[in-house]
C-alpha cells in the first residue's frame, strides 16, 4: 500500500483555494500538467520502438532519458541521479556475477534504509520521501532483472541480452509513477505489433477515460473530502481513509493508461474490486496487482518456510521493507497480512465444515462456468448473507487500516506511536475480530 510514486504528489494533493470549485480547478490543472509530462515520454518511446534503432543507440537513449527524467522530477537533481545510478551499478554488477537474486534484493533494501538514515541525520526526511517511491520501483525492476539473469543458466550474457535488461531497468515512462511490469511483460509490450488504426484509437480512448477518472478521484481526495464536515469521528476516519484510497487510485489508473498506450494489457487496480471486495485477501491482491505479482512470484511462491502463515508474514515483511524504515507502513502491511490470513483460515473452515461457498476466494471458473462442489452454492440465501457480512467487514478493515494516513506527518514520515494511537480510538477492533476468527477456526 503506497501512493508515494511521484516526487511531487504530496504537493499536487495539497488543498488549494477557499472553495471546492477553486480547489478542484487547481488540482485538475496540477495533475494534468504532471501527467502530460509523463505522456510525452510515453509517446516518445512508443515512436522509438517503431524506429527499430540499433541496440547500442536505443540503450543509450533509455539511460540518458531516465537520467533526465529522475533529475526533472526530483528537488535535488544531481544527488538524485547519483543515488539512482548507484543502486543500478551495484545491482547490475552483482547480477552479472550471478549473485543470488534474493541477496541482491536484500542488499538494495539495506542501501535504501541506509540512505534514509543519512537523510534523517541531515534533516532531509522530506527529500527521502520524494525519492523513496522511485527507488522502490527501481529496486523491484533491478531484482526482477537479477532473477532473470541468474535463472537464464548461461555462463556469460551476450550484448543483446544485456541491452534488453538495461532497457527494462531504464524505461523512462515507468520510472516515476510506474507501473511495475515483469520482464516478460516488458518484452511482449516492446514487441507488440499494431496492425489496425481502430485498435490504436480504441486504446487511446480507453486510456483517456482512465486518466479522466484518475484526475476526478484526485480532486475528490484533495478537495471534496477536506471540505466535507463529518458528523462523527467514524465518518471523519472513513473520509480520511477514502482520501488515501482515492489518491492511490489516481496513481494506479494513470499508470495503467501509460502501459495501455504502450501496448500492455496489465491491470494495475480496479477501484470497484477494492471498495466492494469479497474478502480482505482480495483487497490486498487487488490493491496494486503488479506489486502483488512481484511479491507473489518472487517471495510467496518460493516457500521459504513449510508454514503458510510464515510465508504470508515474510511476503508482507518484504513488502514493508521495500518502503524503508516506515513504521506506519510496516504496521499497516503486517496488520493487513494478519487480518487477511485469519479471515482466510476462518472462512475456509466454515466452507469445509458446512459445505458453503464462503471461502475468501470464490470457486474456480472453467469455460465461463463456475465449478462449485459445495452443497450451498454462491446464490444460496445463507451464503449470500455470509459473503455480504464479510464484504462489509472488508470495507471496515479499509477504514481501519487507512484512517492512519492523515496529513499531520505526511511530509516527514509518521512516528511509531501515531498508528497505534489512531487504532486505539477504534479499540483495535480489526485485530480483535481477527484473533476471534483464529480461535473460532480451531473450535468449529
Swiss-Prot record:
Which residues are listed as membrane-spanning?
29-49, 81-101, 128-150, 163-183, 201-221, 249-269, 304-324, 326-346, 383-403, 420-440
This entry carries the following GO cellular component terms, namely: endoplasmic reticulum; membrane
Q: Chief localization class?
A: membrane
Task: Write the gene name.
Answer: mom-1
Q: Which organism is it from?
A: Caenorhabditis briggsae
Q: What is this protein called?
A: Protein-serine O-palmitoleoyltransferase porcupine
* Bilayer topology annotation: Multi-pass membrane protein
| Subcellular location as annotated | Membrane
From the broadest rank down, the organism's phylogenetic lineage runs: Eukaryota, Metazoa, Ecdysozoa, Nematoda, Chromadorea
Question: Which positions make up the signal peptide?
Answer: none
Amino acid at each position: 500500500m503506497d501512493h508515494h510514486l511521484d516526487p511531487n504528489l504530496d504537493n499536487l494533493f495539497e488543498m488549494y483555494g477557499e472553495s471546492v470549485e477553486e480547489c478542484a480547478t487547481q488540482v485538475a490543472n496540477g495533475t494534468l500538467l504532471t501527467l502530460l509530462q509523463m505522456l510525452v515520454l510515453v509517446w516518445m518511446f512508443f515512436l522509438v520502438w517503431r524506429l527499430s534503432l540499433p541496440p547500442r543507440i536505443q540503450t543509450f537513449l533509455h539511460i540518458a532519458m531516465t537520467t533526465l527524467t529522475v533529475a526533472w522530477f526530483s528537488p535535488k537533481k544531481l544527488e538524485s541521479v547519483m543515488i539512482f545510478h548507484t543502486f543500478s551499478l551495484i545491482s547490475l554488477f552483482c547480477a552479472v556475477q550471478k549473485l543470488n537474486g534474493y541477496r541482491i534484493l536484500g542488499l538494495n533494501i539495506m542501501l535504501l534504509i541506509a540512505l534514509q538514515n543519512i537523510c534523517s541525520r541531515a534533516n532531509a526526511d522530506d527529500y527521502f520521501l520524494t525519492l523513496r517511491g522511485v527507488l522502490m520501483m527501481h529496486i523491484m525492476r533491478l531484482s526482477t532483472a537479477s532473477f532473470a539473469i541468474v535463472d537464464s543458466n548461461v555462463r556469460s550474457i551476450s550484448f543483446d541480452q544485456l541491452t534488453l535488461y538495461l532497457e527494462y531497468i531504464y524505461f523512462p515512462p515507468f520510472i516515476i509513477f510506474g507501473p511495475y511490469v515483469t520482464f516478460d511483460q516488458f518484452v511482449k509490450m516492446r514487441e507488440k505489433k499494431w496492425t489496425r488504426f481502430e485498435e490504436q484509437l480504441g486504446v487511446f480512448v480507453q486510456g483517456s477515460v482512465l486518466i479522466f477518472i484518475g484526475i476526478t478521484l484526485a480532486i475528490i481526495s484533495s478537495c471534496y473530502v477536506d471540505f466535507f464536515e463529518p458528523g462523527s469521528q467514524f465518518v471523519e476516519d472513513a473520509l480520511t481513509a477514502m482520501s488515501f484510497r482515492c489518491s492511490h487510485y489516481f496513481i494506479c489508473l494513470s499508470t495503467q493508461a501509460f502501459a495501455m498506450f504502450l501496448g500492455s494489457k496489465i491491470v494495475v487496480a480496479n477501484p470497484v474490486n477494492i471498495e466492494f471486495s469479497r474478502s480482505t485477501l482480495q483487497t490486498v491482491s487487488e490493491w496494486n496487482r503488479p506489486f502483488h505479482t512481484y511479491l507473489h512470484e518472487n517471495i510467496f511462491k518460493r516457500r521459504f518456510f513449510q508454514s503458510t502463515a510464515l510465508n504470508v508474514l515474510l511476503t508482507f515483511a518484504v513488502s514493508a521493507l521495500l518502503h524503508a524504515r516506515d513504521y506506519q507502513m510496516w504496521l499497516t502491511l503486517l496488520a493487513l497480512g494478519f487480518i487477511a490470513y485469519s479471515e482466510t483460515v476462518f472462512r475456509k473452515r466454515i466452507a469445509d465444515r458446512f459445505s458453503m461457498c464462503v471461502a475468501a476466494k470464490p470457486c474456480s471458473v472453467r469455460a465461463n462456468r463456475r465449478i462449485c462442489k459445495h452443497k450451498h452454492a454462491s446464490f444460496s440465501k445463507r451464503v449470500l448473507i455470509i459473503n455480504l457480512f464479510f464484504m462489509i467487514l472488508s470495507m471496515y478493515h479499509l477504514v481501519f487500516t487507512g484512517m492512519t494516513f492523515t496529513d499531520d506527518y505526511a511530509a516527514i514520515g509518521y512516528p511509531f506511536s501515531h498508528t497505534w494511537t489512531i487504532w486505539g480510538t477504534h479499540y483495535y477492533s480489526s485485530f480483535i475480530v481477527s484473533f476471534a476468527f483464529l480461535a473460532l477456526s480451531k473450535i468449529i
